[in-house]
């Protein structure tokens, strides 16, 4: 068996366009997660038959995952109707399984993840753990950037890419990834769960999130580029296609035309919002995994363009910048967290997606908030929210971020994936290692909605008669799809005047 070391390159490209949003409370009514220890047979992923029914040639006709991005030379009828393939999906998503330990048992601590799992469906449980991983990754990232830097990541894309990679991992490398991603916690939570359940749920999640006719546009595509003559295992290519809808494509990374061709492809996927994503690539690269996400949503309560005005935004105790502040009035859910000393506002998009805006009361409160952010905290916010008429002021912002996540993932404990001694024998019989995990994304938050003609109909009462939520200092934002509890995007806006 050959063991020459090759490079594995991962690109995660995300882009989001948002129509309308809202901000903090100037006057608002103040109103140890450990899974049950089990010893799952991690090698079952490799020993069990993961095969699912092979997808017909007409791949993704009614699903936005690949529908709009047909490879050159292929026709529409080469894609399939996922509505027919996944006709059972919604029932599967809503299944609530029994837990290994009752969340009311005395030996289960108050912070145990099983308490969060209680009453949740399979896919919600997986997404709770995806969010837990995302919050931990965010904490590592924010320690690597300046306090005044903006941050933007797409947790669903990162977890999907890692799940896809894990299909080809073996031994300690596989267990390390599954432990840090909390997939191991998921498997231990119920006797009905095994490793194959995780990949099945990612498959189902793709169908749920990227299906049409939800009132928003959410698109994703996974591409697997393989260097010519690289001996990638057929079993890995098959599993990646079946579970993650990633198509293996032949590539010549030493060809300068590859960069321009891929950039054009990405630009098409993201509707022109991400350009020149690839600037250079190591000719020695053997495999590149590309995950792209595009989102555009319309606010339920829109912001009249004529109400946008210049407003002070406090960067810190001493510095202030002028920003374009949007303004609207309507019924909004909001909460006050006295423990973390912050206000939370929920801004709804059409179709079951919403953005949580989290604003510390004190300028120094961001560090505490970032350190304490967990799925349990978010659930506490959501359960304590009250609905009433509020005036909302939120700055327009656009974030463009580009990260190499290798060092961040290493700091989290995922080291063997990037080491020459890592075991990726399920991908190739040659020794390979990942030397780049690129995560790039863009988000734009403004007044726009799908029905711009209606945005001028919002009326305003005198400010003194309303509860006002003004976002005029650094804040966090979290974007969730509610039925699946999926954390799509999250970030920090420290300075709206900068990208």
From Swiss-Prot:
Modified residues (Sulfotyrosine): 79, 92
Keywords, in A-Z order: Blood coagulation, Chemotaxis, Disease variant, Glycoprotein, Hemostasis, Heparin-binding, Phosphoprotein, Protease inhibitor, Repeat, Serine protease inhibitor, Signal, Sulfation, Thrombophilia
Signal peptide range in chain numbering: 1-19
Hydrolase among keywords: no
Post-translational note: Phosphorylated by FAM20C in the extracellular medium.
Annotated stretches, region: Chemotactic activity: 68-79
Stated consequence of mutating residue 122 to Q: Greatly reduced thrombin inhibition. Normal glycosaminoglycan affinity
Domain remarks in the Swiss-Prot or TrEMBL record: The N-terminal acidic repeat region mediates, in part, the glycosaminoglycan-accelerated thrombin inhibition.
Protein name as annotated: Heparin cofactor 2
The species this protein was found in: Homo sapiens
């Amino acid at each position: 068996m050959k063991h020459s070391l090759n490079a594995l390159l991962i690109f995660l490209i995300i882009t989001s366009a948002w129509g309308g949003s809202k901000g903090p409370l100037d006057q608002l009514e103040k109103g140890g997660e450990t899974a049950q220890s089990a010893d799952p047979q991690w090698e079952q992923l490799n020993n069990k038959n993961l095969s699912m029914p092979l997808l017909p040639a007409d791949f993704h006709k009614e699903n936005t995952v690949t529908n709009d991005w047909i490879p050159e030379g292929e026709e529409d009828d080469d894609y399939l109707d996922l509505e027919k393939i996944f006709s059972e999906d919604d029932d599967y998503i809503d299944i609530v399984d029994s837990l290994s330990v009752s969340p009311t048992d005395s030996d289960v601590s108050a912070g145990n993840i099983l308490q969060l799992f209680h009453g949740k469906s399979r896919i919600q449980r997986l997404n709770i753990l995806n969010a837990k991983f995302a919050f931990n990754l965010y904490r590592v990232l924010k320690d690597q950037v300046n306090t005044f830097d903006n941050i933007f990541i797409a947790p669903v894309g990162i977890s999907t890419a890692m799940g896809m990679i894990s299909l080809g991992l073996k031994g300690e490398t596989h267990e390390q990834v599954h432990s840090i991603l909390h997939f191991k916690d998921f498997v231990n939570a119920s006797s009905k769960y095994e490793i194959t359940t995780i990949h099945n749920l990612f498959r189902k999640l793709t169908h749920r999130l990227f299906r049409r006719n939800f009132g928003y546009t959410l698109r994703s595509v996974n591409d697997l580029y393989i260097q010519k003559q690289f001996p990638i295992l057929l079993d890995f290519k098959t599993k990646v296609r079946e579970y993650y809808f990633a198509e293996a494509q032949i590539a010549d990374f030493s060809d300068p035309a590859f960069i321009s061709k891929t950039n054009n492809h990405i630009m098409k996927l993201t509707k022109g919002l991400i350009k020149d994503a690839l600037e250079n690539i190591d000719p020695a690269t053997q495999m590149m995994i590309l995950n792209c996400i595009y989102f555009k949503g319309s606010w339920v309560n829109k912001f009249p363009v004529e109400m946008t005005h210049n407003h002070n935004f406090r960067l810190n105790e001493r510095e202030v910048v002028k920003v374009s502040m949007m303004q609207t009035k309507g019924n909004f859910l909001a909460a006050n967290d006295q423990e973390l000393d912050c206000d939370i506002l929920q801004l709804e998009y059409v179709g079951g997606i919403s953005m949580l805006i989290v604003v510390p009361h004190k300028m120094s409160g961001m560090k505490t908030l970032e350190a304490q952010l967990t799925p349990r905290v978010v659930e506490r916010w959501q359960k304590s929210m009250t609905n009433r008429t509020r005036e909302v002021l939120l700055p327009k912002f656009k974030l463009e971020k580009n990260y190499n996540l290798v060092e961040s993932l290493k700091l989290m404990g995922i080291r063997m994936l990037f080491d020459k001694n890592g075991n990726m024998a399920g991908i190739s019989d040659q020794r390979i290692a990942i030397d780049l995990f690129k995560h790039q994304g863009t988000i734009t938050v403004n007044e726009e909605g799908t029905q711009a003609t209606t945005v001028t109909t919002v009326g305003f009462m005198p400010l003194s008669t309303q509860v006002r939520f003004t976002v005029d200092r650094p804040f966090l934002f979290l974007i969730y799809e509610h039925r699946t509890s999926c954390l799509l995007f999250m970030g920090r806006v420290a300075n709206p005047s900068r990208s």
